[in-house]
A protein has these predicted regions:
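Conserved ABC ATPase signature
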Residues: 206-210
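Conserved ABC transporter NBD signature motif
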Residues: 73-84, 138-139, 188
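The feature captures the beta-strand-to-loop junction immediately N-terminal to the Walker
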Residues: 49-50
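A short, flexible loop at the N-terminus of ABC-type nucleotide-binding domains that lies
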Residues: 9-13, 22-35, 66-72, 89-92, ...
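ABC ATPase NBD coupling module
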Residues: 85-102, 120, 128, 180, ...
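Short catalytic/signature loops enriched in Gly
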Residues: 11-12, 291-375
């Protein structure tokens, strides 16, 4: 008997239910997402892995409400902390992106304004909707006053400032000067927390003056500024060298705990998933074919596509050339019938082209969409 792998309840910050999406193009309609289902728990670092063009980034854009004009969601729901974001009005979605959802993209230079300093761009976040950030900014400064960095007792000379801030917090009101001062203090502390050297200097710099790794750290700091419920990280280490890549990944993992956010990490690299994720979903041609805890997936992959992906990863302990998956990724304008992987699957049989397999639970927190396991 088939079983949904999403779990209703208070532990899920994100729940996607039977999401179908297509793109209208001159060549025809592209069936980009074919009824995907997944859930992410509060505080979880969840990996979404698959080949290029399988629908990973489209999933993130649908969650964030950033789809291009030629995209159409034909069915399904996306719940963020119990609220269906697909039903939100444009202004409500903008506020959700400002406070509840943050997204980090592959190329930070594309999304950073080249003519504004880093500090100006970070300040824009709070200026867009200052009432959303008063509590965060004031509480940050109060913590600085009460717990000095050098470990000394609080400066008695700051007591008046503390009283004024406490009043501002109670009344939810800050003047422009106070807002700018608190924003700068908070932004610099975030730049420091993402381990940027000389954060005060970086605050005054322009994006072109920073390296690729430094720009990506700035993007993470800007995302943290919102203290989002859900952080979407789309191929954020692809353009970075291996050393910087490892630093960014461990930074993301540490900060996830610090700001108590859930993270959807999108990647084509299984090694990244193994390094930092708690659970992972494997995606193929607009379908999720397997979901499991990371250790379980690497120890006991079940779907033929998952097995093929793992077999194609180069390994230092094997002298032979890694295996490749036969065939090519299907054209999603006219995708294969039934299971979309069946034309490339070494285990395919007569049922596979006739209908789409259901996602079933085959073990604790391990789900697979394949007729080999009764789907």
């Amino acid at each position: 008997m088939s079983q949904s792998h999403t779990q209703e309840g208070g532990d899920d910050v994100l729940s996607i239910e039977e999401l179908k999406l297509k793109f209208h193009t001159y060549a025809g309609e592209v069936s980009a997402l074919d009824g995907i289902r997944l859930s992410i728990k509060k505080g979880e670092l969840f990996g979404l892995v698959g080949e290029s063009g399988c629908g990973k980034s489209v999933t993130a854009l649908a969650i964030a409400g950033l789809l291009p004009p030629n995209a159409e969601i034909t069915s399904g729901d996306v719940f963020l902390d119990g609220k269906n974001v697909l039903k939100l009005k444009p202004e409500e979605m903008r506020l959700a992106r400002l406070k509840d959802i943050a997204m980090i993209f592959q190329d930070p230079m594309t999304y950073l304004n080249p003519v504004l300093t880093i500090g100006s761009q970070m300040a824009e976040i709070t200026r867009a909707q200052p009432e959303l950030f008063v509590s965060t900014l004031v509480n940050h400064r109060l913590r600085q006053i009460d717990r000095p960095v050098d470990g000394t007792v609080p400066d008695p000379g700051l007591l008046a400032e503390r009283e004024n801030l406490a009043h501002a917090l109670k009344s939810q009101g800050l003047g422009r000067k106070e807002l700018n001062q608190l924003t700068k203090s908070y932004a610099i502390s975030l730049l420091k927390s993402v381990r940027l050297p000389e954060p005060e200097k970086v605050y005054e710099m322009y994006p072109f003056e920073l390296s690729g790794g430094m720009r990506q750290r700035v993007m993470i700091a800007m995302a943290m500024m919102r203290r989002p419920k859900l952080l979407l990280a789309d191929e954020i280490t692809t353009a970075l060298d291996v050393t910087v890549q490892a630093q960014i990944l461990h930074l993301l993992k540490d900060l996830r705990s610090e700001i108590n956010s859930s993270v959807l990490l999108i990647t084509h690299d299984l090694a990244i998933v193994a390094e930092v994720c708690d659970r992972v979903a494997v995606m193929y041609a607009g379908n999720i074919v397997e979901i499991a805890e990371v250790d379980e997936l690497f120890r006991n992959p079940l779907h033929p596509y998952t097995k093929g992906l793992l077999a194609s990863v180069p390994r230092a302990d094997l002298a032979r050339t890694p295996d490749s998956i036969e065939g090519s990724v299907p054209d999603l304008i006219s995708p294969p019938s039934g299971c979309r992987f069946h034309p490339r699957c070494p285990k395919a049989f007569e049922t596979c082209p006739s209908r789409k397999p259901s996602m079933i639970e085959v073990g604790p927190n391990h789900y697979v969409s394949c007729f080999l396991y009764g789907g």
